[in-house]
Amino acid sequence: MARKSLIQREKKRKKLEQKYHLIRRSSKKEISKVPSLSDKWEIHGKLQSPPRNSAPTRLHRRCFSTGRPRANYRDFGLSGHILREMVHACLLPGATRSSW
C-alpha cells in the first residue's frame, strides 16, 4: 500500500493540472502563431509561470485500490497483482484467465 501522502500529492497535481490546462494550451497555440522570436520568448516565459506540479507530465497513474505506481493497466485502473486477484475471484466482469 502506498503512503497516503503520496496519493494526496498525486491528487493535488491532478487538481493543479486541470486548473492550468487552458493557460498552457493557449500559450502553446500563441507560440505557434507568432512569427518573431522575441515574442515567442515572452510567451515562453508565460508558459513557465504556472507551478511545476501543474504540468501534465508530472502526473503518474496509480492503482485505484492500493495506490501502487507501477504495473498499472489503463483499462481497469488497477496494478497487475490486484488485477490478477480480482480476476481469480470473478470480481471483474468479462475478464477471463488465459489458458493454452
Swiss-Prot record:
One Pfam family this sequence matches: Ribosomal_S14
UniProt keywords, alphabetically: Chloroplast, Plastid, Ribonucleoprotein, Ribosomal protein, RNA-binding, rRNA-binding
Ranges in coiled-coil conformation: none
GO biological process: translation
InterPro entries xrefs: Ribosomal_uS14 (IPR001209), Ribosomal_uS14_bac/plastid (IPR023036), Ribosomal_uS14_CS (IPR018271)
Molecular-function GO terms, alphabetical: rRNA binding; structural constituent of ribosome
Entry annotated with the keyword rRNA-binding: yes
Gene Ontology CC terms, in alphabetical order: chloroplast; small ribosomal subunit
Domain of life, source organism: Eukaryota
Cellular compartments annotated: Plastid, Chloroplast
Function: Binds 16S rRNA, required for the assembly of 30S particles.
Protein family: Belongs to the universal ribosomal protein uS14 family.
Quaternary structure, from the entry: Part of the 30S ribosomal subunit.
HAMAP family (UniProt xref): Ribosomal_uS14_1
Name of the protein in question: Small ribosomal subunit protein uS14c
